Amino acid sequence: MGLQFLAPGEKVFPSLHRIIISTFALIAAYIFIVRPLRNILFHPLKKYPGPKLFGASSIPYGFYYMTGKWHLKIRNLHATYGPIVRIGPDELSYACPEAWEDIYGRYVPTKRRENPKPVWYCSPDAHDMVGASLGDHGRMRRVMAPGFTYSAMCKQEPLIKGHVDMFLSKLCSLCGDGRAEVNILDWLTYCTFDLIGDLSFGEPFGCMENNMLHPWLQLVFANIYITHIILLCQRIPFFYLFLPIKTTYQLWRDFRRHVVLLREVVERRLSLSTPRDDFLDVMTTKQTSTLYMTKEEIFKNAILLTGGGAETTSSSLSGMMYMLTMRPDVKEKILEELRDTFPSEDDINMRSVAQLTYTGAFIEESMRYYPPGPNTMWRITPPAGNTILGDYIPGNTIVGIPHRVLYRSEAYWKDADGFRPERWLPDSQRPAEFDEDKREGFHPFSYGPRACIAMNLAYAEMRYILARFLWHFDIEATKESKKWMDDQKAYLVWDKPGLFVHLKPRAGVKVAA
């Protein structure tokens, strides 16, 4: 009966075309209007200061991260809004040293749950310490800890010394009898990856021998941008629209091929019956029913130690080399300390360099000024939420501390943008103007039970390499490298251009063959 009221030619049902358009319009209205308004007006984090646009959607954050300039934007946001800033609908950034314990500290029953790493950042299925669950992380860390003790470092020193000898010898051959222009970043990368690779896989990558990065490492360094955009896409699927499909597929294919080759290296090392005092020795000996590592965990942690350990060390050392070229006064103070402490190069070893007070202060200041991990190491509150700085934070909130922002904050550091190694000297030697610096808030290797297990080894290596390098060479900036730090892009690590310097061997100093 009702059909008789329809106008001539009018359809009972709308066309499929109109249904599709209406559906997309509703979805778009929800994504771009309803959800952003809900995030601004009704979200549990609405009380925290920050730009409304960032509180409405994660997309503005994602665009800044894609450009590699997020470390600059987040500093401006903290300067405008204060130490706690809402930078996404469900994300808070803390630029205050008091937050380290609450965000990265250990699980304390009845007081604080652990804030795990988000699965899009570090998956528990990765079989390494970074993404492992609380129990698996503790088990793996207890297995590996003996490899990073003082006594283990002493056993590893001959191997480390051999690689540093080759590093110095290669630089000396490049210089010949005079001054040479050298990309010191490349050679620091070759040295640290050969060294850590030898400790992790049982053989070096051959970077110094071949004057080039191993193909696996070339793949990693040539695709820093793509690998970090993939990480961003896993967090914010919208950015898959900007992912170059062909390049990403080639990267995935090449990684799979190199993983097969690296597995063969590990198998070859594990088949050896002779102990080498390396990390694989530690991971495979004295295993029990509760203290063990599977073969997959051994392999994945070997990759983790190589990539994470070597990149952090080479990045930090390159920052130090740059500062030596820009601050000749600081370089002279380090040289004076070396000459006063060591009668000869034979006295320089990984234990004796620990007594270098000013050199140690220089290393700390270099990592404050140019932290190897400039941005945030993300954590996420558990589903039941957590308490941070006395405030309840809802579950599944992303939280973290941006290293570079905290270390350059005038609220916590005197002359924060100045390079002042003396701020790290012992109390009796430190100028009074730095007494209020928040040195206890400085954690370049992270904080808590998941802090870098190789931190002490990294510090010893950096002191040792730096001391022996300056014993052998004078270093000066080239014209093109004087602004080396100025325009670098930053993701989880720095995307660094070549650091070209002038090297000149010191008269009368010979390098071991």
Curated annotation (Swiss-Prot):
Cofactor entry: heme
Residues at which heme binds: 452
Entry-linked Gene3D superfamilies: Cytochrome P450
PROSITE patterns assigned to the protein according to its UniProt record, in alphabetical order: CYTOCHROME_P450
Pfam families registered for this protein in UniProt: p450
Reaction catalysis annotation: dehydroprobetaenone I + NADPH + O2 + H(+) = epoxybetaenone + NADP(+) + H2O; dehydroprobetaenone I + 3 NADPH + 3 O2 + 3 H(+) = betaenone C + 3 NADP(+) + 3 H2O; probetaenone I + 3 NADPH + 3 O2 + 3 H(+) = betaenone B + 3 NADP(+) + 3 H2O
Pathway terms, separated by semicolons: Mycotoxin biosynthesis
CDD domains: CYP60B-like
Alphabetized SUPFAM superfamilies for the sequence: Cytochrome P450
Highest taxon of source: Eukaryota
Enzyme Commission identifier(s): 1.-.-.-
Molecular function terms from GO: heme binding; iron ion binding; monooxygenase activity; oxidoreductase activity, acting on paired donors, with incorporation or reduction of molecular oxygen
GO cellular component term, pick one: membrane
Alphabetically ordered keywords of this record: Heme, Iron, Membrane, Metal-binding, Monooxygenase, Oxidoreductase, Transmembrane, Transmembrane helix
Transmembrane segments: 13-33, 212-232
Subcellular location: Membrane
Membrane topology: Multi-pass membrane protein
Enzyme superclass (EC): oxidoreductase
Annotated function: Cytochrome P450 monooxygenase; part of the gene cluster that mediates the biosynthesis of the phytotoxin stemphyloxin II. The first step of the pathway is the synthesis of dehydroprobetaenone I by the polyketide synthase sthA and the enoyl reductase sthE via condensation of one acetyl-CoA starter unit with 7 malonyl-CoA units and 5 methylations. The C-terminal reductase (R) domain of sthA catalyzes the reductive release of the polyketide chain. Because sthA lacks a designated enoylreductase (ER) domain, the required activity is provided the enoyl reductase sthE.
Family of the protein in this entry: Belongs to the cytochrome P450 family.
Name the UniProt record assigns to this protein: Cytochrome P450 monooxygenase sthF
Organism per entry: Phaeosphaeria nodorum (strain SN15 / ATCC MYA-4574 / FGSC 10173)
